[in-house]
Each structure stands twice: as structure tokens, then as C-alpha cells.
Amino acid sequence: MRIHEVTPKEGSTKRRRRVGRGISAGQGASCGFGMRGQKSRSGTGTKAGFEGGQMPLYRRIPKLKHFPLVNPKHYTIINVGKLESLEPNTEVTLESLMEQGIITTNDGPLKVLGDGTLTKALTVKAAAFSKSAQEKIAATGGSWEVLSRKSQQDTEKDE
């Protein structure tokens, strides 16, 4: 077998369409473009979404607000009232709360909210705090520290 004897498998190739070669060829005269008009001329034709001058669909539909975020931030949420069960002067992190069973599911970095009362001084380390949570932790003599989201995600990957 030589290179000039190699042919494609039967039925794998289609004959190309020869347009403008007479009426008997099937694509003669107007070459399959119909009679006149913008779609028969050379060039790009109409833009996508053009409806012939009718008000297009994307302009008929109202502009809706409050679409959901594509990549929303998901936090593991806890209120300061739940931290009341911990011993005074302990360091509170997502890992320590998981170990003690106060938080059962890890939905992402820890966020502390201000619902409930807190009477013990604690050192709380979390990715985010609400204003009321910061005030309640500081009022008891405790401290709070904002961890970066990356540092918390790195510890989650290690586990």
C-alpha cells in the first residue's frame, strides 16, 4: 500500500456543496440564500437577539434586582450565648468548638453573632464578627481576633 492509494472509509466523507453552478445542481442562482434581503447579502447579517425591529425579548423583560450571588460566602455561625457553656479564659476557635460538640457541622469559616448573653472572658478567633458580638466579648474582658479566610481554609484542607 502506498500513500496515493490511501482513501477515506466509505461513507465517512460528504461531498462539499457547490453553489451557484446552475439550477439543476440544487443550489444555483441564489445559492440557498433566498430572494434578496439582509440575510442574502455578504457580511455578517443581523446581530444575535435581533427580532426584525420588534422590541427584543431582553428589553421586554423587567430588570430584576437582588439576583443571588454566584459565589456567596458561607459561614459556620454561632451566637455568643452558646459560648457561655465554655470555661473562662479559654481560646475559642472553629476546631475547639467542633471538638467540644458545640458545633456539629462545618459550613465554612466561623462567624460569631451577638444573640444571647456572655459573662465569661474568652479569647475568640473567627473569620467574622458582628458589631454586637464584638461589644459583648469586649464587655466581659475577653478579646476577639479576625482570622483571614485563607488561614481557616488551609486548616480545613489539612484535616
From Swiss-Prot:
Protein name listed in UniProt: Large ribosomal subunit protein uL15
Keyword Chloroplast: no
Region entry Disordered, spans: 1-51
Superkingdom per UniProt: Bacteria
HAMAP family given in the database record: Ribosomal_uL15
The gene coding this protein: rplO
NCBIfam families: rplO_bact (TIGR01071)
PANTHER family: 50S RIBOSOMAL PROTEIN L15, LARGE RIBOSOMAL SUBUNIT PROTEIN UL15M
GO molecular function terms attached to this record: rRNA binding; structural constituent of ribosome
Bias (Gly residues) ranges: 23-35
Record field: compositional bias (Basic and acidic residues): 1-13
GO cellular component: cytosolic large ribosomal subunit
GO biological processes: translation
